[in-house]
């Protein structure tokens, strides 16, 4: 069975008992979470979120990239969120490479020119959280005077550690 077939089978089971079709579009807890796409992270579980509680925006590293800012602006302006939580994590792949490394790999394997792309890797986990919190707080596209907090999720213990 292919992955697509497995997903379709799982969705059939999910949809057969689905009863949340009337949830409102705006998240009930008025919060957006920006975190990493790493498969070891399950933000709904480790934050105690239910369906409809929050916007969860995921990308490589949980970075406050232009696209993440775009999503946060939509979340705030059109759907009423007024808090942002940034969560990076231990043992993140973004700590393992430099832009030059990935650009070279893309050139060698795909003959793709990625010189213009910043993949946003980082060397210091806590500093990356601080940087992304600052990017969000300083973005002209996002609300001022709202709670923007940063955390590190420990993949070994499941604990959230605040970053100040």
List PLM regions with ranges.
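Divalent-metal-activated hydrolytic enzyme cores
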Residues: 1-28, 62-67, 74-79, 94-164
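Divalent metal-coordination and catalytic microenvironments
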Residues: 11, 33, 57, 86, ...
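Conserved beta-strand-loop surface patch within small alpha/beta domains used
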Residues: 17-70
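Short hydrophobic segments within beta-strands
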Residues: 34-36, 87, 151
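Gly/Ser/Thr-rich loops at beta-strand to alpha-helix junctions
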Residues: 37-39, 90-94
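Short glycine/serine/threonine-biased micro-segments
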Residues: 46, 50, 59, 91, ...
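Ordered, amphipathic secondary-structure segments that act as subunit-interaction surfaces
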Residues: 79-92
